[in-house]
Amino acid sequence: MKPIIYIKYGELTLKGKNRAQFIKVLVHNIKQMLLEYHELVYQVGYDNLKIINLEKYNLQQVINDLQQVYGIAFICVAYQVNKEINEIQLACNKLVNNTDQTFKIEARRNDKSFIYDSMQIKQICATYLLQNQPTLKVDVHHPQLLINIEIKHDCAIVYGHKIPGAKGLPVGINGKALVLLSGGIDSPVASRLIMKRGISVDFITFITPPHTSQKALDKTIALAKQITLNNHLTKANLYVCNFTKLQEEIAHISKESYRITLMRRYFMRIAKRLAIDIKAGALVTGEALGQVASQTLNSMQTISSVLNDFLVLRPLITYDKQEIISLAKQFNTYELSILPYDDSCSLFAPKNPTTNPNVQTAMKLEQESLVLDAIYELVFTKEITKINLSSK
């Protein structure tokens, strides 16, 4: 009797007519995550996925990889047996690693034609365990081991501990967004949270050589790879925009306090145009309300006004910094994010950036330059490089 992996789907089971598409996307994502395990066999069910042929692989490593995939409610090590009560009993016995513990059995029949009802299945299997392992004890309220028996139409599944999945929705089921990715803590976390809601991502980052170094770009590439788990979670590209020419022109505006505001307005303009080109339906930022000068209500309104009606998603808008750091550590992006390489925002930030900008002043300052729009057009058409994260 060999173990299998038994996966229960997450939120996608609530989606009615779209169920088949949700399952298709989830199974595809699982296969992408487990691409290196060449001999695995997948059996797709209405509310579950079974993975068999695991003998050659490290079972715990497969489970660890599966825990990263959005759309999974829980994962179990299980036994798939014939619908014979003696085989079900043996499978229950396989799950008992410690004979000095309490247990409870739950049973469910999808196949109502099975000879025993749920209560009888529980009684027969519990009696078998107690006879074969006398030190076991039944505890129906707080058992140390909960054994689950599911009688399917074609087999019986027996499993114990439920390992939590990442939950959420399968990445890609809700379209694509373009993430404005910096080398900081926030935007990588925002990326993962938006992926959890079923959105695939591409990234855009802004560099200002020679003011920013190659190491700073390498850090951002490493972050993008970690966010996507080397493109196993989603097939993403990183677009690198050389912003130096625009940055140097913005540095000459008459109101230094507006420098970051104008810079971010051009970030948004460039990101929107790129998003439309790559068929992304929204932009994603790591903004958290009130965290820095450019993230007040007035600042965000002034900056995003250049987008007209184009959608901006801000998954971190209500989070405080410690919550974001905690998630960054969970996603293994934190240590990369705190590497000491400056990005374009930090290098060009004024001493006292405005926290209360307005659209009219921002537009007036942009109009001070006779060449700003021409430089913007040049940067968008000539200064964006695409990096395929699967190959670099």
Swiss-Prot record:
Pfam families xref list: ThiI (PF02568), ThiI_fer (PF22025), THUMP (PF02926)
Organism: Ureaplasma urealyticum serovar 10 (strain ATCC 33699 / Western)
Lineage of origin: Bacteria, Bacillati, Mycoplasmatota, Mycoplasmoidales, Mycoplasmoidaceae
Catalytic activity: [ThiI sulfur-carrier protein]-S-sulfanyl-L-cysteine + a uridine in tRNA + 2 reduced [2Fe-2S]-[ferredoxin] + ATP + H(+) = [ThiI sulfur-carrier protein]-L-cysteine + a 4-thiouridine in tRNA + 2 oxidized [2Fe-2S]-[ferredoxin] + AMP + diphosphate; [ThiS sulfur-carrier protein]-C-terminal Gly-Gly-AMP + S-sulfanyl-L-cysteinyl-[cysteine desulfurase] + AH2 = [ThiS sulfur-carrier protein]-C-terminal-Gly-aminoethanethioate + L-cysteinyl-[cysteine desulfurase] + A + AMP + 2 H(+)
Task of the protein: Catalyzes the ATP-dependent transfer of a sulfur to tRNA to produce 4-thiouridine in position 8 of tRNAs, which functions as a near-UV photosensor. Also catalyzes the transfer of sulfur to the sulfur carrier protein ThiS, forming ThiS-thiocarboxylate. This is a step in the synthesis of thiazole, in the thiamine biosynthesis pathway. The sulfur is donated as persulfide by IscS.
Gene that specifies this protein: thiI
Main localization, broad class: cytoplasm
PANTHER family listed in its UniProt record: TRNA SULFURTRANSFERASE
InterPro entries the record matches: Rossmann-like_a/b/a_fold, ThiI_AANH, ThiI_fer, ThiI_N, THUMP_dom, THUMP_ThiI, tRNA_STrfase, tRNA_sulfurtransferase_ThiI
UniProt binding sites for ATP: L180, L181, T205, F206, R264, G286, Q295
GO MF entries: ATP binding; CCA tRNA nucleotidyltransferase activity; tRNA binding; tRNA-uracil-4 sulfurtransferase activity
GO cellular component, one term: cytosol
GO biological process: thiamine biosynthetic process; thiamine diphosphate biosynthetic process; thiazole biosynthetic process; tRNA 4-thiouridine biosynthesis
Name used for this protein in its record: Probable tRNA sulfurtransferase
EC number: 2.8.1.4
Subcellular location: Cytoplasm
EC class: transferase
